[in-house]
Amino acid sequence: HSTMRTRYFFAILLLVPVVYFNVKAQGLPDLGEASQSAFTPAMERQLGQSIMKEARADPSFYDDPEITDYVAGVGNRLAARGADTRQSFEFFMMRDTQINAFAMPGGKIGVHTGLITAAQSESEMAGVLGHEIAHVTQRHIARMVSNQQANQWVSLAAFAIALLAARSNSQVSQAAIAAGPALAVQQQLNYSRDFEREADRMGLQMLEKAGFDPRGMELFFERLQRATRLVEGGAPSYLRSHPLTYERIADMQGRAANLPYKQVADPIE
């Protein structure tokens, strides 16, 4: 079934913020050279193109040129100030009321319509986009893959099943999450807090350099945390895709406070 296959691929993409990788997050780390041999940029591009074919065939793919061009304009403005200006990006929309965005291999960035609705300023939306762009420029997917063992693709499939189950209430999904391989997945679905902090900090730099209000990131995080607090409190920790912690918000507040203040008029279009 096309829709199910697409969700399967999207579940894999959510691995970026949730798979554990033991990297040091003291300051702003360098691009991971170890990732180059395990999962090359060419492999990332090929995988990204394959997944995009599935995305475009999904009924929730939101083909609105005006909105897509607007989001792409903001995203490319940020990417031009990123860590890897050679990386090209493609931004696309998914019709989904959930507040979310996600990074895919090869510089593909998916944005839910719910994110656009929830953002109260252009800088808030840009803060989320900058975070996802940083996942790509810092090669988090490649660094995750390089940390897997010989059965890495089997592990990815198990992760996908577990995350797919999180988005469905079907008995089949519940059975999948209870299966032996998925139970092992639970132990690995610890948040990569280092990846998230890294993406926050790189995203904040892009936000400031591109002329947005750097406080947009922390303000949106705060609102998102308030909106999801009840859901997070009742969900198994291994099914949460982003660790929205007070620590992350405090870190962003501290870093933004040290940047020169500038007034930005940025109503979202």
Feature-to-residue mapping (PLM):
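Active-site-flanking alpha-helical
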Residues: 52, 114, 134-142, 251
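Hydrophobic or amphipathic, alpha-helical segments that drive membrane association/targeting
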Residues: 3-102, 184-185, 227-232
